[in-house]
Amino acid sequence: MRLPSLDIDSWCLYSAEAAHDTLPDSFSIPSFEERNGLTRGNAARLLFDIMVTDEQGERRSFQEIMWTIIAERVDGTYIGILDDQPGCLEPRSNNYLIFGAEIPFLPEHIIEIAYPPGDYSDWQLNLNPERCWPR
């Protein structure tokens, strides 16, 4: 499965592993075993790089940390449902990144793990995704 890229999608995910290797004392991440063992309904926090065209027509890069609720895993790739709205984007029809969009990611992208209440995860995962990532 293809992962997002700035060139194609105008957004991508930073590697939490690379960030940790660069700044091990100030950027901690869960163990690989924890990041690799998540299941449906668990939450994973990811670091996004988002390209936005400003009012002057200039392209600018914004970084946002957002949560996803894991829906499934396909051939080693997690598919999470975005559980945040990017602050740098308007929630309109031409933006892929909106609350409820499918987000593909790998264990290397996870910066934090949470275990939301089951009723919340069930609610989020029983909705149809607002955006579906190509399989």
PLM region spans:
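Mixed-charge, low-complexity intrinsically disordered regions
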Residues: 1-135
